[in-house]
Amino acid sequence: MLDYDKEAERYDISRGGEPRAAAAAEGVLGLVPVQARSLLDVACGTGIVTRRLAAGRPGLRVTGVDRAPAMARYAAARLPGAVVLADGRRLPFQDAEFDVVSSVWLLHLVEDPVDTRRIVAECARVLSPGGTYVTTVDKGASHNVGSDIDVVLASRPRRPASDTDALVESYAVGCGLVPAGQARFPGRGQGRSPRRAIADLRRGWFVTLPPGHPLADDFAARLAALPDQDRPRPDPAFTLRAFRKPVPGSFLAG
């Protein structure tokens, strides 16, 4: 996995910057009930999306949390007084404290299924009855846009995805949440060129091909042989799922 303290300085510019953040925030807010008054953004990173969540819904109190100190510092500069340094597996908040909890581009990073379930359970715990949990799913699959780069990388070693739609739904339902909608948004500025794919490979972006892996040079050579080395291929499209916490005694609560 990438070192997100080292990654913080170049995180935004390497991942589509403000256009991608705007698309992500719009997607999340489209699943947030109009009556919501508080939102917790788990794994807020540099706060580039979190800030737009706050700006995009007047009256919504937004709090960010991230476990990487460097990321949290960037986020705190964007949202003074509203960012907490903490691990998503052990959120330092009371039960039922937030009307909405979001986790954008988080669950795909978690290698241990036990930890994935713990994160979803924590998000459910701090969610108020009637509240909504919004999270990205199938992040890795979203980057497969059918390009020539994807053809080259199709045979690379893979680990099982930790954020498949079915898995995340099973974790959410296991915590007492119920499905409440979905949305898609474009990953603007994230269409890879072959040259960019090689750079990502060299710095460990593909976790099963870390720098120094015996196969890394072979994949780099195959990417270097592709035409139009600097032409970005199509942007990915990311998927959001929403889950609601039933109000006790309501129809949805059974």
What are the roles of these predicted feature ranges?
Residues 1-36, 48-52, 71-74, 132-162, ...:
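Conserved class I S-adenosyl-L-methionine
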Residues 38-42, 46-90:
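Class I SAM-dependent methyltransferase SAM/SAH-binding core
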Residues 102:
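A conserved beta-strand element that flanks and buttresses the S-adenosyl-L-methionine
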Residues 105-109:
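Short catalytic micro-motifs in class I SAM-dependent methyltransferases
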Residues 178-254:
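Conserved Class I S-adenosyl-L-methionine
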